[in-house]
Every structure is written in C-alpha cells, then in structure tokens.
Amino acid sequence: MFGSIGVLSFAPFSFKYALVVSYTYLIYKLFRSNDNRNLNNLFLWSFGYWGIGTSWIIVSIYYYGNVSLLGSITLFLILSIGCIIFFFLPILLLKRVIINKSNNLLLFVPFILILVEFGRYYFLGGFPWLLPGYIFLDTPYEILYGLIGVSGLSLLLYIFVASNVVLYSNKTYLLALNLFLFISLMSPNIFESNKSDGDIVNLAIIQPSTDPFKKFDNDYLNDIEQEFVSLSSQAAEKADILVWPEAPLPYTSESARSQNLIKNIEKPLISGFFSYQDGNLYNSIINSEQEIKYNKRKLVPFGEYIPFESFLRGLISFFDMPMSNMTRGDSPKQMNVGYGSFSPLVCFDIVFGEMVRKDVKSSNYLINVSNDTWFGNSFGPYQHLEISRIRSIENNIPIVRATN
C-alpha cells in the first residue's frame, strides 16, 4: 500500500509529501524494523509504486491494442514486474551486505537508489519514469532543476528519507525537519523561470483530439484532414507558426496527399509525420520551411517497435498494431523557422533529460509533439506533461507542446 501512496506525489494528484512518507516507510521496514518479511515488504512496495504509477499502460493495451482484458492484465503485469525487478534486486543486495549502522544507512541507501535511477535511464532503451526528482515541480525547489537537475533533486530526497530513518528515535528533530519539508512542498513557487527578453513569437497549437481508431480508418480520413485545415486557417490569422501533434495522419510526409495538404497551410508548419527514408519507416517531425526531418530517437517498446520481434510478432493482435515497425533516429536535429531555431522532440524523447540537455545548447525553444490519446484519461498524459514542463525549466528554455 505504501508504494502506491508515493504515486500521489506525481501528476495528476501532486500531493508532494506523499513520496517522502512512502520512501521513509520502505527504508525503515528494510533497515530498521524487526519484521523479517523484508522480501515481501520490498516486493509489495515496488508493486504498489510501479503497478499503480504506470497503470496507464493497460489503457493502450486493452482499448487500442485489441487485446482481451485477461491478456491486457497479463501483459501489464509482465511489464510491471520488469520495472520491479530492476528496482528490487539492487535494494535486496544492499540489504544483504550493509552493516546496520546509521552512518552506513545514510551513505549507502541514497547512493544505491541514485545508481538504480541512472540504470533505468539506460537499460533496454531506458524508462526514466516516476523519478522522485519530478515531485519538486511547482514548489520553491523548482529553481534547483537548472542547477542540479532531476537526479540531483532525487538524491536530496533519498538523503532526506534515509535521515528520517536514522533520526527515528529523536522525535523532535524528526518532526521539525518533516514539518519544514511538508510546508515548503505545499508552498507555491515564488521564483520566476524562463523569462525571455527576446522577440515575441505567436505560435498556434492545433490539437483536434482525433480518435486513434478513426485515424487509421479511410472512411474518416477526409474529415480529419479538413478539421486540421480548418483549425489551421482560423489560427493563421494571428499566429506566426502552426504546430501539429505527433503523426496526426496515417500516411507519410513524402506522399502526394501530405504534400498537397501542407501546401494548403498558410503559415510555416511544424508537425509530426510518419516518414519513409531509405527503406525504413520513421516517426518524424517535419518543418515546411526546411527539407530536413527529425527522426524520433527513443522509440516506445511494443508500440513503435517489437522487442524480440521474430518471436512475438503475430503472437497476439497487440504485437501487430499499426506502425509498430519503426526505425530509431540516429542524431539530433536543430531546425530553423523564420523566428529562430528550435530543438524538435517526439513524444517519449522528452523524458530523457540528458539527451535533451545536449540538444538545446543553441536553440531558442523546444518543440515536443506527442499523441497521448493512446492512454485516454489515465495518469499517463498528466505525468508526461509534468516531465515536459521540467525539461523546459531544467534548460531555461521555453517549450511548445502539441499533443493529440
């Protein structure tokens, strides 16, 4: 239960202090409690945290993957257990080798937890989701994103919760520290960020909320195209640049149909599009002002590519979803439009903070296109937006985000 309590710290709930309670409980149970059920405590906490926190995955599997409820739950459990094991094993190893003294607890627990966090960034393509450092958004600590990043704030939280366990017998210090943190986390951010003295650019974000089922149904294609053209024409009266979401239409940017559509747009257009290059299918961003394309570098497993494809492809309908044979892009791109340069990012790309940091060095702003309708009204789109906002603050650069 206490693992699931920690999920309340993230969007859409944003009760920040819940994660402090959750992690303090975990570390206390593992390293200070006389309870011999360490394995059970760790597994149940991990399942509550990852199972509830990433429950949005089941929405895309069940509703849009055309998989039975039982099959959806089974796949979701397999994916959740993968997250759990990656978190579970290093903590269990630490429990086996640590000497049960306060100074060791303070030294080793935060260190191991932050190593696990780094590992999740890189292992099997990476899944840096539900990081403790995310909870400091919209608090006075938000200013630290630009100084020490998400990982630095995660480390500070790990040190704090380990200190809670060390100070457990000293109730006065424990209460004072936690009261201060609770009040400060509940306080609004008073520091300005992303203030720019540059030229003002008017961008219009076109988000028609297209049903994913209809997008791949030819009976609806003309209506979807007309909606994009109509909304863009209305927005073009005041906007300098138009931004469409990720892959808003089911054909490639090279097709005659897409070229004709783009010609009907009155202003510079930045949009997600499928693209076909050198025999490979990509999830891309196109710029109507330039020939170059940006190809998404962080593909979503089981959605845009199928791991172990020779074994899994065709096993169930979920593994044959449209456009699930994408190729990964191999380099960042900086794009230019009449009002400056921007770093393009597609959907899951925005989650990888270190990659984004390297991309934005000479850009005026970020543009992130996404298609979060695959996850309905679950936690996923809210958590995704939360992470996107943090990327902007970390790099002190404005972000434009269009999602369907």
Describe the predicted segments one by one.
Residues 193-404:
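Soluble catalytic domains of enzymes that build or remodel membrane lipids, polysaccharides, and related
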Residues 1-191, 388-391, 398-404:
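Membrane-embedded alpha-helical bundles of multi-pass enzymes
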